[in-house]
């Protein structure tokens, strides 16, 4: 019986963190779920900036309220707290915080700190035990989590086509702490963005197959264009992906092409970049889930005579074992394929392997 329960449970644990949430309140159309996890995590690497304790916890809630038969209000908040730093250090941050309204089959609208629509597709490969999903990053235009997202989503195309989902999104400017690009939440150039728009379409074809595409285009700030790498009026992202999720097998791949939107270490952005991620996993009924993946990001026509350079390139081999719905452990080996050379050193790009060992309690 335990084996059968695990085989049904594990796929649910691999989606949003709130899938295993604890229901705190559910009465009169009002519902509140609390979720979280503690990851006792350690990295082993020759890279001194990565090697060592990486323990952290995440805590969040999801709530909704039934206004009437066709209108539902909802909100979500998620916070991360690092457990590998001293008590006098402020090392925590908000991952998401947004509120919205759902209008029956007409779709939903929300605003706040959320995921960019590009992640609707690239998230399909962001399922590795520890690493992965790093051909893009947070607070990088509309590629992952960011501030000031206004998002309209529609599931099953107004209730007419099962599995056909689309989203349209706007992101407001997040500029610098002072000067021409100043906004109330100023930040460094690598995490700034101008006004942006994006959209995504995903279609579940049935039998476990899915296909999706997403695009985004954001204005760049003048501060960003003061950097040497990746000058241009706009940052653009075009992505497409495929996945298969059935019969205990998970396969996914995504290809993304960007213009002035993929970071070149700590130097700026690539004028053009080609990003590729592919992952394969299998879920055994007794709780073991092995995983293998390949990720590469290649920058094109880089300044200072660097030309074409790999910004990221590695093979990932790992496995997760689920004791039950609340407890798991994993190992993840990032086999770095980048060479240590002038470019990687100047850009601050690590070329060392990393082995991650984690023990996770989640609710």
Curated annotation (Swiss-Prot):
Membrane as UniProt keyword: yes
Membrane topology listed for this record: Multi-pass membrane protein
Gene Ontology MF, one: porin activity
Disulfide bonds: none
GO biological process: monoatomic ion transmembrane transport
Signal peptide, first to last residue: 1-21
Record NCBIfam families: PRK10554.1
Function: Forms pores that allow passive diffusion of small molecules across the outer membrane. (Microbial infection) Binds CdiA-EC536, probably acts as the outer membrane receptor for toxin CdiA-EC536 with OmpF.
Subunit details: Homotrimer. Probably forms mixed heterotrimers with OmpF; other mixed heterotrimers are also probable.
UniProt-recorded name of the protein: Outer membrane porin C
The species this protein was found in: Enterobacter cloacae subsp. cloacae (strain ATCC 13047 / DSM 30054 / NBRC 13535 / NCTC 10005 / WDCM 00083 / NCDC 279-56)
């Amino acid at each position: 019986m335990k084996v059968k329960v695990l085989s049904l449970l594990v796929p649910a644990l691999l989606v949003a963190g709130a899938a295993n949430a604890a229901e705190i309140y559910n009465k009169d159309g009002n519902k509140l779920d609390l979720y979280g996890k503690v990851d006792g995590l350690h990295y082993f690497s020759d890279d001194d900036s990565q090697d060592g304790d990486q323990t952290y916890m995440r805590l969040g809630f999801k709530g909704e309220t039934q206004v009437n038969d066709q209108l539902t209000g909802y909100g979500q908040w998620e916070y991360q707290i690092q457990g590998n730093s001293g008590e006098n250090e402020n090392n925590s941050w908000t991952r998401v915080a947004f509120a919205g309204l759902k209008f029956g089959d007409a779709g939903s609208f929300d605003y706040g700190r959320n995921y960019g629509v590009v992640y609707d597709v690239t998230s399909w490969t962001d399922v590795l035990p520890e690493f992965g999903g790093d051909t893009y990053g947070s607070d990088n235009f509309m590629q992952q989590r960011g501030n000031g997202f206004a998002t309209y989503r529609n599931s099953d195309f107004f209730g007419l086509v099962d599995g056909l989902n689309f989203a349209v999104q706007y992101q407001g400017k997040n500029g610098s702490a002072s000067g021409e690009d100043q906004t109330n939440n100023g930040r460094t150039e690598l995490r700034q963005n101008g006004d942006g728009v994006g959209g995504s379409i995903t279609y579940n074809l049935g039998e476990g197959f899915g296909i999706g595409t997403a695009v985004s285009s954001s204005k760049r700030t003048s501060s960003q264009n003061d950097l040497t790498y990746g000058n241009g009026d706009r940052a653009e992202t075009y992505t497409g992906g495929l996945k298969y999720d059935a019969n205990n097998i998970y396969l996914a791949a995504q290809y993304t092409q960007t213009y002035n939107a993929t970071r070149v270490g700590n130097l700026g952005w690539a004028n053009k970049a080609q990003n590729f991620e592919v992952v394969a996993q299998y879920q055994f009924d007794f709780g073991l889930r092995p995983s293998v993946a390949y990720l590469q990001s290649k920058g094109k026509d880089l300044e200072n005579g660097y030309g074409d350079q790999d910004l990221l390139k590695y093979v990932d081999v790992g496995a997760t074992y689920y004791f039950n719905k609340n407890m798991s452990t994993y190992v993840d080996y990032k086999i770095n394929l980048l060479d240590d050379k002038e470019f990687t050193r100047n850009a601050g790009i690590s070329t060392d392997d990393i082995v991650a060992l984690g023990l996770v309690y989640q609710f």
